[in-house]
């Protein structure tokens, strides 16, 4: 099984796709583009697979983009 990415790598993919940091509450950061808002738990060494799939769905970015880092 492939190694799951850290929150830093997930955030870098979001930034590459035009998302910008909006706010943080506790350990959750909010990133937003023109249409969508994505919540990322940060900092984490590994993002759990279910959370990663949820981030993929919220952002509209293919799951494979996050795995192939």
Language-model segments: which ranges?
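Basic nucleic-acid-binding interfaces
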Residues: 1-25, 30-69
């Amino acid at each position: 099984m492939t190694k799951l990415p850290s929150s830093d790598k997930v955030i870098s993919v979001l930034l590459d796709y035009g998302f910008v940091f909006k706010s943080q509450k506790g350990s959750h950061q909010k990133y937003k583009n023109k249409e969508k808002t994505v919540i990322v738990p940060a900092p984490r060494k590994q993002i759990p697979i279910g959370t990663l799939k949820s981030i993929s769905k919220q952002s509209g970015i293919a799951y494979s983009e996050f795995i192939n880092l």
